[in-house]
Amino acid sequence: MEKSVCIRTDDFFHYLKKGAIPPHFPESNAQNGVVIEAFSEAAKRFSRGGYDVYVDGIVGPWFLEPWLGAARKGYEVHYMVLRASREITLRRAVERSKLDLKTNTELVEIMWEQFCDLGKYEANVIDTTAQTVSETVQSIKAHLKSGQNRIK
């Protein structure tokens, strides 16, 4: 990898100003779709520029259409979900949250439920419950090398 870029999806949500709806509210679905399309387009542009692109953020299967479209157009797209047990997920999230404890706990529990059974994408899950950050990085590299999480 000679050139790479990491796109943090949260950054794109922070670009929203006037009229922004918190992304966890049900009425934010259309806004969230626009944001996902925006960072998908940014990823494709960097890829065309010769960069390996890593998208770091919460992207559920319900928002994969832009990525499936990119894969159909020949972009190499890998979809991996890093998931720990509920208990570990809550502990990790609370340690790094900018929200109050109650709100953060509620949001993480909702998201964990959304990601605890991904149906046909369950094979794309990397269980990070017992992994260190370094071990998780190695798991991601192994999955990329094998191509097992490449979507077409």
Would you name each region that the model predicts?
Residues S47, L144-N149:
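Short, hydrophobic alpha-helical segments
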Residues A30-H78:
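Glycine-rich phosphate-binding loop used to anchor ATP phosphates in small-molecule kinases
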Residues E95-S139, Q148-K152:
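Small-molecule kinase domains that catalyze NTP-dependent phosphoryl transfer to phosphate-bearing small molecules
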